[in-house]
């Protein structure tokens, strides 16, 4: 009479055990699938991103001026060897800006700042692909120029060449013979934004070389401090004081560069003075609550992200009132990028690309994607699980998914089925607006007769590997024509942003907590 209930209990226990076992198995399968799906989203393209990164790095070599060392670009040679001679300084190094032979200090300094940031955040990823030394070499080639362009505390040479004269020619840099005039800023003709951006570049680069070359790092930091003081104590826009630059790299203001430079100097020195500057000038220059687009002209989004980094990792600053506006605006920038966010920007093509400007359209989606991966990695590394966007919450993986979508579009997942990174994939631009790439290396072509190569119907004889062209129109279309400089001209600052983005995507998400 007693055995039956016991038998029922045993059966029930076995039954419950089986149910639990099945539940565990289902949970394990779900977890594996979930991880697998995440891996498919974030990992299946890692090899593609790595290959693209290797290609992207080559464009810095293509753009080098000066006496080339260990040159692996067969169609490039020494050029610009006398640059700076009229001021008795050596400005032979540096990078040509785009498809021409100009050296514009403002975007070149931005290139150096972004490349430094990329190395600081993702140097380990670069090293795993044997690209770190290459990146540091490209950076030093640029900062060597910037150091020489700053011969005294309140003087900075910001341009080599006259763009009007330069654009009347279509020739190889190795064969140009025209006079290379210099443009400078000083206390009589200030240019706060250029001086401050160059200070940011020097400060960021000083961190890159802090361990490998302490003497060079110290030199960079000395110049950074001097340039920041020069910029702050002699405020004035270079676009106003030198109107000729307005047709090329016109600045919309210098407040963002001052905050950007002070932020980098704080990271490089931990001198409270620079953090105080940021806190005291944030209301005036920070444009709090108004998300904007990171570019060679607008450093605010980058500043917001860089300063929010301190709230993630710096003890005692997580609740800093002086950084609150920067952190909140950084969050607003991120919320605007996630497509399903209630505050998502509508500035996108039907193909899903962030689209802000017809000229150099890819700069903004690539820069936005780079910032998104940075912020995602800051969240993951610090254990912050959610980003609040109005009444909805998003995960770091949502930011990373957005970043991948922009990278994938750039690399060929777009309506044109074209890679906009030259040399990557089966289809990419063949008529890039780039003088050196368009003229055979053995051609004896001068200034004027070189235009036959601009107007040639034949693809470029030299492939400008790693060049990121301007990109598509709002309707996702692209015209691969050499005279289409709006869509088909590359630039060095685009390359710095691409290197940062791709470096962040070649491995699992993580971030160093301090530089």
UniProtKB/Swiss-Prot annotation:
Q: Which Gene3D superfamilies match?
A: 1.50.10.10
Per the record, the GO terms for biological process are: cell wall organization; cellulose catabolic process
Q: Where is the protein localized?
A: Secreted
Q: Which reaction does it catalyse?
A: Endohydrolysis of (1->4)-beta-D-glucosidic linkages in cellulose, lichenin and cereal beta-D-glucans
Cellular component GO terms held in the UniProt record: extracellular region
Which keywords does the record carry? Carbohydrate metabolism, Cell wall biogenesis/degradation, Cellulose degradation, Glycoprotein, Glycosidase, Hydrolase, Polysaccharide degradation, Secreted, Signal
Question: May I ask which residue range the UniProt record assigns to the signal sequence?
Answer: 1-31
Q: Does the keyword Ubl conjugation apply?
A: no
Q: What is its EC number?
A: 3.2.1.4
> Which InterPro entries does the UniProt record give?
6-hairpin_glycosidase_sf (IPR008928), 6hp_glycosidase-like_sf (IPR012341), Glyco_hydro_9 (IPR001701), Glyco_hydro_9_His_AS (IPR018221)
Glycosylation-annotated residues: 37, 250, 475, 483
User: Could you give a GO molecular-function term held by this entry?
Assistant: cellulase activity
Locate the active site. 100, 433, 480, 489
The record's similarity note reads: Belongs to the glycosyl hydrolase 9 (cellulase E) family.
Protein name in UniProt: Endoglucanase 2
């Amino acid at each position: 009479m007693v055995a039956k209930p016991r038998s029922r209990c045993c059966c029930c226990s076995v039954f419950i055990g089986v149910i639990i076992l099945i539940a565990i198995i289902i949970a394990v399968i779900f977890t594996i699938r979930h991880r697998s799906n995440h891996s498919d989203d974030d990992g299946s393209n890692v090899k593609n991103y790595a290959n693209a990164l290797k290609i992207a790095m080559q464009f810095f070599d293509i753009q080098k001026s000066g006496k080339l060392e260990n040159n692996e670009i067969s169609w490039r040679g020494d050029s610009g060897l006398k640059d700076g001679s009229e001021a008795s300084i050596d400005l032979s190094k540096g990078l040509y800006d785009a498809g021409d032979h100009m050296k514009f200090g403002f975007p070149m300094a931005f290139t150096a700042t972004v490349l430094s940031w990329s190395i600081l955040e993702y140097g380990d990823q670069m090293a795993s692909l044997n690209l770190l030394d290459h990146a540091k070499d490209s950076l030093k080639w640029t900062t060597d120029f910037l150091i020489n362009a700053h011969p005294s505390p309140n003087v900075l040479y910001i341009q080599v060449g006259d763009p009007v004269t330069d654009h009347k020619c279509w020739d190889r840099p190795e064969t140009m013979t025209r006079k290379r005039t210099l443009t400078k800023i000083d206390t009589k003709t200030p240019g706060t934004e250029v001086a401050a951006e160059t200070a940011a570049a020097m400060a960021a680069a000083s961190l890159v070389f802090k361990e490998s070359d302490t003497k060079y790092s110290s030199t960079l930091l000395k110049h950074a401090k001097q340039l920041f003081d020069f910029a702050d104590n002699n405020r004035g826009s270079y676009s106003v004081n030198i109107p000729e630059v307005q047709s090329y790299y016109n600045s919309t203001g210098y407040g963002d560069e001052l905050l950007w430079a002070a932020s980098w100097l704080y990271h490089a020195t931990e001198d409270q003075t620079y953090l105080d500057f940021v806190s005291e000038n944030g209301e005036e220059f920070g444009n709090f609550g108004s998300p904007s687009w990171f570019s060679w002209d607008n450093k605010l989004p980058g500043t917001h992200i860089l300063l929010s980094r301190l709230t993630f990792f710096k003890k005692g600053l997580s609740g800093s009132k002086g950084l609150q506006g920067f952190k909140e605006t950084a969050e607003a920038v991120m919320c605007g990028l996630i497509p399903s966010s209630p505050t998502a920007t509508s500035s996108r093509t039907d193909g899903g690309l962030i689209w802000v400007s017809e000229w150099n359209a890819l700069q903004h989606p690539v820069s936005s994607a780079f910032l998104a991966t940075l912020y995602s990695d800051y969240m993951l590394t610090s254990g912050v699980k959610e980003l609040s966007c109005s009444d909805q919450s998003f995960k770091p993986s949502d930011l990373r998914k957005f970043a991948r979508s922009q990278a994938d579009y750039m690399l060929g997942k777009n309506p044109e089925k074209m890679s906009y990174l030259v040399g990557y994939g089966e289809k990419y631009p063949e008529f890039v607006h780039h003088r050196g790439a368009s003229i055979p290396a053995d051609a004896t072509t001068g200034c004027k007769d070189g235009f036959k190569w601009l107007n040639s119907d034949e693809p470029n004889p030299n492939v400008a590997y790693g060049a990121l062209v301007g990109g598509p129109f709002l309707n996702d279309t692209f015209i691969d024509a050499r005279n289409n400089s709006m869509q088909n001209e590359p630039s060095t600052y685009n390359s710095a942003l691409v290197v940062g983005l791709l470096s962040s995507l070649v491995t699992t998400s993580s971030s160093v907590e301090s530089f």
